[in-house]
Amino acid sequence: MGTSLLCWVVLGFLGTDHTGAGVSQSPRYKVTKRGQDVTLRCDPISSHATLYWYQQALGQGPEFLTYFNYEAQPDKSGLPSDRFSAERPEGSISTLTIQRTEQRDSAMYRCASSL
Protein backbone atom coordinates (compact mmCIF):
# COMPACT_ATOMS: atom_id res chain seq x y z
CA MET A 1 0.00 0.00 0.00
CA GLY A 2 2.82 2.44 0.84
CA THR A 3 4.36 2.12 -2.61
CA SER A 4 1.11 2.65 -4.49
CA LEU A 5 0.24 5.67 -2.34
CA LEU A 6 3.65 7.22 -3.03
CA CYS A 7 3.19 6.72 -6.78
CA TRP A 8 -0.27 8.30 -6.64
CA VAL A 9 1.05 11.35 -4.78
CA VAL A 10 3.84 11.86 -7.30
CA LEU A 11 1.34 11.69 -10.16
CA GLY A 12 -0.92 14.11 -8.34
CA PHE A 13 1.89 16.64 -8.11
CA LEU A 14 2.82 16.15 -11.75
CA GLY A 15 -0.79 16.86 -12.63
CA THR A 16 -0.74 20.17 -10.80
CA ASP A 17 2.37 21.50 -12.50
CA HIS A 18 2.94 19.84 -15.84
CA THR A 19 -0.46 19.50 -17.46
CA GLY A 20 -2.69 22.36 -18.42
CA ALA A 21 -5.75 20.67 -16.92
CA GLY A 22 -6.59 19.21 -13.57
CA VAL A 23 -5.92 20.56 -10.11
CA SER A 24 -5.09 24.26 -9.91
CA GLN A 25 -3.70 26.23 -6.99
CA SER A 26 -3.51 29.93 -6.32
CA PRO A 27 -1.57 31.94 -5.71
CA ARG A 28 1.20 30.13 -7.52
CA TYR A 29 3.84 31.84 -5.37
CA LYS A 30 3.40 33.74 -2.13
CA VAL A 31 6.02 35.61 -0.15
CA THR A 32 4.91 37.08 3.15
CA LYS A 33 6.31 38.67 6.27
CA ARG A 34 6.34 36.87 9.58
CA GLY A 35 3.12 37.37 11.49
CA GLN A 36 0.86 37.80 8.46
CA ASP A 37 -1.97 35.43 7.54
CA VAL A 38 -1.86 33.49 4.26
CA THR A 39 -4.70 31.69 2.48
CA LEU A 40 -3.99 29.25 -0.34
CA ARG A 41 -6.72 28.00 -2.68
CA CYS A 42 -7.08 24.63 -4.40
CA ASP A 43 -9.53 23.91 -7.19
CA PRO A 44 -9.58 20.11 -7.75
CA ILE A 45 -10.67 18.18 -10.81
CA SER A 46 -14.45 18.64 -10.84
CA SER A 47 -15.37 14.95 -10.70
CA HIS A 48 -13.01 14.20 -7.79
CA ALA A 49 -14.51 13.71 -4.33
CA THR A 50 -11.28 13.61 -2.32
CA LEU A 51 -8.81 16.47 -1.91
CA TYR A 52 -5.45 16.32 -0.08
CA TRP A 53 -3.14 19.05 1.26
CA TYR A 54 0.63 18.49 1.68
CA GLN A 55 3.52 20.60 2.97
CA GLN A 56 7.02 20.14 1.54
CA ALA A 57 9.92 21.90 3.22
CA LEU A 58 13.11 22.53 1.26
CA GLY A 59 15.10 19.31 0.86
CA GLN A 60 12.34 17.18 2.42
CA GLY A 61 9.64 14.88 1.09
CA PRO A 62 5.97 15.89 1.16
CA GLU A 63 4.23 15.69 4.55
CA PHE A 64 0.49 14.99 4.79
CA LEU A 65 -1.54 17.83 6.33
CA THR A 66 -5.21 16.92 5.85
CA TYR A 67 -7.77 15.62 3.42
CA PHE A 68 -11.43 16.07 2.60
CA ASN A 69 -14.01 13.66 1.25
CA TYR A 70 -16.42 16.14 -0.32
CA GLU A 71 -16.80 18.71 2.49
CA ALA A 72 -16.10 16.29 5.37
CA GLN A 73 -12.61 16.49 6.91
CA PRO A 74 -12.04 12.99 8.32
CA ASP A 75 -8.36 13.48 9.17
CA LYS A 76 -6.61 16.70 10.09
CA SER A 77 -3.91 15.03 12.17
CA GLY A 78 -1.15 16.41 9.97
CA LEU A 79 -2.00 20.07 10.52
CA PRO A 80 1.04 21.25 12.50
CA SER A 81 -0.66 23.66 14.93
CA ASP A 82 -3.79 25.59 15.73
CA ARG A 83 -2.51 28.29 13.34
CA PHE A 84 -3.22 26.00 10.37
CA SER A 85 -6.76 25.37 9.18
CA ALA A 86 -8.36 24.04 6.03
CA GLU A 87 -11.90 23.97 4.72
CA ARG A 88 -13.88 22.76 1.75
CA PRO A 89 -17.37 24.11 2.45
CA GLU A 90 -19.24 22.93 -0.63
CA GLY A 91 -17.21 19.88 -1.59
CA SER A 92 -15.33 21.68 -4.36
CA ILE A 93 -12.76 24.45 -3.84
CA SER A 94 -10.64 24.17 -0.69
CA THR A 95 -8.58 26.70 1.21
CA LEU A 96 -5.60 26.24 3.50
CA THR A 97 -5.00 29.13 5.91
CA ILE A 98 -1.90 29.77 7.98
CA GLN A 99 -2.40 32.40 10.66
CA ARG A 100 0.47 34.45 12.07
CA THR A 101 3.09 32.90 9.80
CA GLU A 102 6.42 31.87 11.27
CA GLN A 103 9.82 31.16 9.69
CA ARG A 104 9.27 27.39 10.07
CA ASP A 105 6.14 27.61 7.88
CA SER A 106 8.35 28.32 4.86
CA ALA A 107 7.60 25.45 2.44
CA MET A 108 5.87 24.41 -0.75
CA TYR A 109 2.18 23.67 -0.15
CA ARG A 110 0.48 21.31 -2.57
CA CYS A 111 -2.95 19.90 -3.09
CA ALA A 112 -4.00 16.83 -5.04
CA SER A 113 -7.35 15.21 -5.76
CA SER A 114 -8.68 11.75 -6.49
CA LEU A 115 -11.93 9.93 -7.14
UniProtKB/Swiss-Prot annotation:
Keywords: Adaptive immunity, Cell membrane, Disulfide bond, Immunity, Immunoglobulin domain, Membrane, Receptor, Signal, T cell receptor. The keyword Hydrolase does not apply. Gene3D superfamilies: Immunoglobulins (2.60.40.10). GO terms for biological process: adaptive immune response; cell surface receptor signaling pathway. Residues 1-21 form the signal peptide. Residues 22-115 form the Ig-like domain. GO terms for cellular component: plasma membrane; T cell receptor complex. It is found in: Cell membrane. Coiled coil: none annotated. Pfam families: V-set. Disulfide bonds join C42-C111. V region of the variable domain of T cell receptor (TR) beta chain that participates in the antigen recognition. Alpha-beta T cell receptors are antigen specific receptors which are essential to the immune response and are present on the cell surface of T lymphocytes. Recognize peptide-major histocompatibility (MH) (pMH) complexes that are displayed by antigen presenting cells (APC), a prerequisite for efficient T cell adaptive immunity against pathogens. Alpha-beta TR is a heterodimer composed of an alpha and beta chain; disulfide-linked. The alpha-beta TR is associated with the transmembrane signaling CD3 coreceptor proteins to form the TR-CD3 (TcR or TCR). The assembly of alpha-beta TR heterodimers with CD3 occurs in the endoplasmic reticulum where a single alpha-beta TR heterodimer associates with one CD3D-CD3E heterodimer, one CD3G-CD3E heterodimer and one CD247 homodimer forming a stable octameric structure. CD3D-CD3E and CD3G-CD3E heterodimers preferentially associate with TR alpha and TR beta chains, respectively. This is T cell receptor beta variable 7-7. It comes from Homo sapiens. The gene is TRBV7-7.
